[in-house]
A protein has these predicted regions:
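Short, structured protein-protein interaction patches enriched in aromatics and acidic/basic residues
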Residues: 55-77
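Functionalized membrane-embedded alpha-helices
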Residues: 74, 80-82, 232
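Short proline/glycine- and polar residue-rich coil/turn motifs
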Residues: 27-28, 102
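Ferredoxin-type iron-sulfur electron-transfer modules in oxidoreductases and energy-metabolism complexes
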Residues: 31-59, 109-259
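Eukaryote-biased recognition of intrinsically disordered, low-complexity regulatory segments
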Residues: 1-26
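S4-like RNA-binding module at protein N-termini
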Residues: 84-103
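Well-ordered beta-strand positions in beta-sheet-rich domains
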Residues: 19-24, 93-95, 182
Length: 259
């Protein structure tokens, strides 16, 4: 298939960005979206850099920078806004799991980086997602002694609680929730992490401290507030539900009442 790509190009976080249009031809419907971008970059490298165009600010003319790692829907690095949707038109998949069969010959595809205050652009389609790491560092862990493996196996956990905890732990931290939210809120990410630990006996000990610390860090890093539009749930590639946000709100309120 032949496609027209409108790709966001931006030198760095402070530079003014713009769209550039490219043509790619003979793309297999079995190719992944990232493989299609690889083909585009091979094409741009073969064409070489036009110093005059770069000097005039008309064309970046170099390969398009985009982030990726595992290409298996695990790491969350391949974070792109495709035709106005986080990770593209398919449901419950990451960008690297999106295949070109979801598009038609002659389509125009608009590709942008994440759009959230907490994710500044590094270059082109690459954004800085360190904010999520900082939120995790604020409390997304268990620091109390939990014993060895035999001790963990000896603690009975109801199956329902274990399943809910694993649902939250499925979060890959891709940032689709914050990028999709009209307020740029990271509540679904924080809620998934808080919920996955608060449901377990080992994580319950620090539940109050964790909820307060992670919410405070989220606010400090410039993420917005949740207004219950549920766009985050719709675009999450792991289909993490807003029930975790409800649990985070309960944990946070109880923690504040204990102060």
């Amino acid at each position: 298939m032949d496609l027209t790509l409108k790709v966001w190009r931006q030198k760095n976080a402070k530079a003014k960005g713009h769209f550039e249009t490219y043509q790619v031809k003979n793309i297999s419907s079995d190719s992944s979206f990232l493989e299609m971008l690889d083909i585009l970059n091979e094409q741009l490298i073969a064409e070489g850099v036009d110093p005059v165009a770069v000097e005039k600010g008309c064309q970046s003319s170099g390969p398009v920078s985009f982030d990726h790692d595992c290409r298996e829907g695990i790491c969350g690095a391949c974070s792109l806004y495709i035709n106005g949707r986080a990770h593209g038109p398919d449901d419950e998949v990451t960008t690297c799991q999106l295949h070109m069969r979801k598009f038609k010959d002659g389509d125009t595809i608009t590709i942008e980086p994440w759009r959230a205050k907490g994710f500044p652009v590094i270059k082109d389609l690459v954004v800085d997602r360190q904010a999520y790491d900082k939120i995790l560092q604020a409390g997304g862990y268990v620091s109390v002694g939990t014993g060895g493996v035999p001790d963990g196996n000896a603690i009975p956990i109801p199956n329902e609680k274990a399943e809910e905890s694993m649902d939250g732990a499925a979060c890959i931290g891709c940032g689709a929730c914050a990028a999709t939210c009209k307020n740029g809120s990271a509540m679904l990410f924080v809620a998934a992490r808080v919920s996955s630990l608060a449901l377990l006996p080992q994580g319950k000990v620090e539940a109050a401290k964790r909820a307060k610390a992670m919410v405070a860090k989220m606010d400090e890093l410039g993420f917005g507030a949740c207004t219950n539009t549920r766009a985050c749930e719709m675009e999450c590639p792991k289909h993490i539900t807003v029930s975790h946000i409800a649990r985070l709100n309960r944990e946070f309120l109880c923690a504040k009442l204990q102060d």
